[in-house]
């Protein structure tokens, strides 16, 4: 079947409307979008059952038959007067049913649609203009099973849903061939009056509005709701669009909402129509009315003021008390899908917030741990909100909303709001030195792990049976309280660490701390939420005891599942703090040490003054012997000693410490430190050998990395094993210089690789390696 035969026997092409989008899988398949009108060339394709050969936009290909709907042929072309006569002869028809002349049959060569507009059509032929497909809708004549008469559908393009589309049953007619309305029905409104261009429809006043025309919905909304909403004869077209106003006039919102409901009744403006030509920040805000001197409307129409008649209002809404000012974050002002069809509200709040007042009342009535949990959560996430908003109502709303927003997985806006409130809570810096910070984080980590293990002790295969749960319910309840308390203490410390990390320039470390803290905080919120629900039911055995395998976890199971993952998250955060302890707590350590050493300052000052006098007396005694010994040495050795003495870096001259002055306080290096010293010296020797043999860059890059890694391990081990303050300061001084030499080695390696085979760059790398080797030997000799 290659087409349908007409009355004269000539084949006519069938038209079909696309029901779904089609993305081609091969070059022979035809791509089309939902609503496109295709011309069926052949329905019986050999060896391709269920596929039709179609034509779209001058391109021929195969299309799946189950995605197309054959349209009945439109009536033959005719002049405009008979068309209007048909409307007059059938007054019983609804105003939405029109007969449309069939479009001309496309030729073998695709003709640009612009040619239809450039040449004015003859005055005798009244054919409606078919606009360009990307910007306007297509007109389709279709027979349906439910309606025996012909109906007109305006099918929108999916890529143009944000633009003001043409209304249903309204067509754009060229100005030269526009026909007057029917004379027999003067009471009817003008049928075809739409701006011919997009610029005119956007900027100028609508001519249809001046004549009392209906303001159309977009075609997608018209198909869904099945009718057109109207506006009460606006005087200016700019009244349709929402415009931002100053915030000082926001106090009259309640009166404006009541007036808009009385004036408009059941009619409403689509929520998204006012967003076409208004700034994004004004979409979710309310605006006061602007009185006009003349005209039936005394106020501008704004987005939140017009009710939508199609959907009932929600059951739970906030009581808009004028004495309470709610602090709504800016991220909540973005309109969401679930709030597109609700009654007007001054504040665009998340979906979870309407349940907050009722939950607050229940928690207020309950006693014991429930109240504690509420206080903990509010102190955690809303301490800053409490200082900004003194009203107790706003504090409770924001605290409860922060808990609900963290748990909401269906709203990205609520999750963003929780993270933003997290960032706004700027934690203070921890006044701790490195040792105290490590001890604190280790103790808090152990406390959390032990509290979680006390709960896991009761979890077994039969722990939810009534007999087992009845015997252990009190202990399980106490274990959940300990988990909440220990995790809250750890979060206090973690917030302080984050505040300390905010002063660093290392963005990677800040990101690690922030992400890991967010993970722990999310787990804490889930534990709080589930524990509150368990407290609300009173830990009833009738609710918690079960002998069956549950398909979905209840509150107690969810608490256990989340608590099981907390120790691992705590361990990761503690590892980050311990590994980067010097960066985080270096400034605090430097500030505290002079205060702690103040009582011994006079003693040390006197000791530093007396030591040079003793050394001067010993030098006077030993001077003749040293001169005699120096005269006996060969001149080459004397010159070498002078060169070494002048070439030494002053920072590398570490004095013989208290290990020689006081033998009782001799430093005893552990086996690990000795191994690291030996490995570092050996790695430096291997690097020097590679540079002497002119090895390729790949070789000495690996060897340089090994030196840096071993050097870092050595410094960490020395700082951990040295606990006495006197020795610790000397070791920190030598370790700091060792780290600077390791950094210089890394920079020299990078420069040598980039400039390879430059002899100067390789020589500089060799010099840095020799400096590092010399300082390592001196450092080791000082400690032993």
Curated annotation (Swiss-Prot):
Similarity field: Belongs to the CAS family.
Quaternary assembly: Interacts (via SH3 domain) with PTK2/FAK1 (via C-terminus).
Record SUPFAM superfamilies: SH3-domain
Subcellular locations according to the entry: Cytoplasm, Cytoskeleton; Cell junction, Focal adhesion
Its biological purpose: Docking protein that plays a role in tyrosine kinase-based signaling related to cell adhesion and cell spreading. Regulates PTK2/FAK1 activity, focal adhesion integrity, and cell spreading.
CDD domains in UniProt: SH3_CASS4
Name of the protein this chain belongs to: Cas scaffolding protein family member 4
Gene Ontology biological process: cell adhesion; cell migration; cell surface receptor protein tyrosine kinase signaling pathway; positive regulation of cell migration; positive regulation of protein tyrosine kinase activity; positive regulation of substrate adhesion-dependent cell spreading
Keywords: Cell adhesion, Cell junction, Coiled coil, Cytoplasm, Cytoskeleton, Phosphoprotein, SH3 domain
Modification Phosphoserine occurs at: 197, 246, 302, 373, 387
Annotated region (Disordered), positions in chain: 343-376, 614-635
The UniProt record lists the keyword Manganese: no
Main location: cytoplasm
Domain SH3 per the UniProt entry, residue ranges: 11-73
Taxonomic superkingdom: Eukaryota
Post-translational modification: Phosphorylated on tyrosines by SRC.
Coiled coil regions, renumbered to chain: 466-536
Pfam families linked: CAS_C (PF12026), Serine_rich (PF08824), SH3_9 (PF14604)
GO cellular component terms listed in the entry, alphabetical order: cytoplasm; cytoskeleton; focal adhesion
